Amino acid sequence: MMSRLNSVVIKLWLTIILIVTTVLILLSIALITFMQYYFTQETENAIREDARRISSLVEQSHNKEEAIKYSQTLIENPGGLMIINNKHRQSTASLSNIKKQMLNEVVNNDHFDDVFDKGKSVTRNVTIKEKGSSQTYILLGYPTKAQKNSHSKYSGVFIYKDLKSIEDTNNAITIITIITAVIFLTITTVFAFFLSSRITKPLRRLRDQATRVSEGDYSYKPSVTTKDEIGQLSQAFNQMSTEIEEHVDALSTSKNIRDSLINSMVEGVLGINESRQIILSNKMANDIMDNIDEDAKAFLLRQIEDTFKSKQTEMRDLEMNARFFVVTTSYIDKIEQGGKSGVVVTVRDMTNEHNLDQMKKDFIANVSHELRTPISLLQGYTESIVDGIVTEPDEIKESLAVVLDESKRLNRLVNELLNVARMDAEGLSVNKEVQPIAALLDKMKIKYRQQADDLGLNMTFNYCKKRVWSYDMDRMDQVLTNLIDNASRYTKPGDEIAITCDENESEDILYIKDTGTGIAPEHLQQVFDRFYKVDAARTRGKQGTGLGLFICKMIIEEHGGSIDVKSELGKGTTFIIKLPKPE
């Protein structure tokens, strides 16, 4: 109900109705008052004219009694006539009740003395009670010299008339006026409602448009064809709505681009306002904040506070959960509406870079060690032979055998480095052929039979000799050689190395399993990384470059397959190779 009363249509309609009603009431009151006054005055003037004529008639008549009777015949109905010579000595015996009361009014009302003493006409309204009801009369006294009077200068002609006819006329006029006013008010009400609806229709459209704009809908643009102020307002509002839509679209596009850029960043990004609340973040930052510990959180808060104080960019290193981060905090003058400042925090995960740098350092150290050892042996044994320290044929033969072994070791190390360099520069190529897998495994069996016996290992090959695979013999030989060498390095006498094959609907599967020392869980995700090496303390004494498993992964992936590892520390390791079946 209140919302309807607050409507512009209702307010305008009620205003028009109130104004028209007020005007009609005032006009009706003025008209009724005027008509009452008019008819009263007309009646009074008519009575006065009658009194004047009677006065003249009686004064000019020789037979005054006949003239009075004649006048009474004319006036008595519906009014009354009295000619009073002396109001103080007037007999009431032959008068009617109304005339008696009229005579009493003349006698007792001092205003009528002016009729007898000054010769003035006097008019008064007199209320007469008769038969339990009251009736109002107009009583007029008119001076005359028709009869001689020793007590006063004038006699009086008094005519009274019932005002009921005037009241009836006034009532009829009042009813007609009220009915006319009601009809006019009804017509005005309908017209005012139509007019107010017509006038406010563009305003209601503008209201609907403003509501839709506030809700983000800029498509509704009502057309107002009027050339008045409302039409101009509508055109201006449509123009404003179009410009707002363009600005909002531009802001939305910018925001979407910004959000996409922020979410696509590998760094975690946080926006912090003056209240130290996060107002902006991307997925990476959310993941980091979900896993942050108390020490790292305190470190981050200290850096943020330092940035607020210094208003300078701060860059610090953070280590958390065995990962390494670089935290950069930058002061921003305006980060929120109202010109409030804040800090943008960028958290970059440098774990891979840190590990790569560490692996490079380890690689340089390992390669230096690997190169120094065979070179030192080569130099020592050759110097012994050249200097004649070793002269016996058997000793010379043993020294040359050591030189040969170390040369092979040095050659293998250099070949691994050259292979990786070649693969980085030229890529890796494989020549797959459909051939029995048994050919490769038989080759491995012959190759490592003596080594297994020397190391005291149980090496078994369980495979289906009739099964054919699609693979490059030389590349797969390189893979298995690397994997079996690794297995031999991480086992001790009595352990077992088993090579078995299997299949599923789309892949051929090869398992290389050992019961050696195994690999710790924190190393499993990095064993295939370039230059990565597991703790050398668990190896048999041979060092490597950390490139073997990296090369194996590249070869298998070039075949269109995959290589995975499962290991449990202290129980052994299993490498799983999956190659697509021949078409």
UniProtKB/Swiss-Prot annotation:
Residues covered by the Histidine kinase domain: 366-583
Annotated coiled-coil segments of the chain: none
Residue intervals annotated with topology Extracellular: 33-174
Keywords, in A-Z order: ATP-binding, Cell membrane, Kinase, Membrane, Nucleotide-binding, Phosphoprotein, Transferase, Transmembrane, Transmembrane helix, Two-component regulatory system
Ranges that cross the membrane: 12-32, 175-195
Residues with the Phosphohistidine modification: 369
Cytoplasmic side: 1-11, 196-583
PANTHER family: HISTIDINE PROTEIN KINASE SAES, TWO-COMPONENT HISTIDINE KINASE
Protein name: Sensor protein SrrB
Organism: Staphylococcus aureus (strain N315)
